[in-house]
Amino acid sequence: MPLYPIKLYVKHLPTLLCIGISLLLNIFTWIWLLIEIRPQTEPVFLHYNILFGVDFVGEWWQALYLPISGLAIIVVNAAMGWLLFSRDKFLAQILNGISLFCQLFLLFAAALLVFLNV
């Protein structure tokens, strides 16, 4: 089965909204983490557990794993959505919606990281 034209896939309104908002949230997460968690020699808190408190510390750049994983989720889901769009548009929209949902949770996790380290 031939691939759906990528220009038409990106111009589809639900796809455009989900991918666009996901990318904006990811860019905001990058900027926020880079502004708030600056390069430093002392370790930063990377994980907080309600039972044990801070249980994972590391280098400042390890906090950037959040937006990196978010970008990977966007790229993989958008590519899979494009491949599936000609067969099942609903499934492609679900994949892009999941990307948006993941970005919201990653932004929340970034907020916790920032407030834990500031």
Named regions from a protein language model:
Residues 51-71:
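Interfacial helix-start motif at the membrane-water boundary
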Residues 108-118:
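Juxtamembrane boundary at the C-terminal end of a transmembrane helix
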Residues 2, 71-87:
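Transmembrane alpha-helical segments of integral membrane proteins
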Residues 34-45:
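Membrane-helix interface motif
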Residues 81-104:
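Cytoplasmic juxtamembrane regions at transmembrane-helix boundaries
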Residues 18-31, 104-106:
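Hydrophobic alpha-helical membrane-insertion segments
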Residues 9-24, 93-98:
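Alpha-helical transmembrane segments and their helix-start/interface "positive-inside/aromatic belt" motifs
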Residues 1-11:
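Short, Lys/Arg-rich, polar N-terminal cytosolic tail immediately upstream
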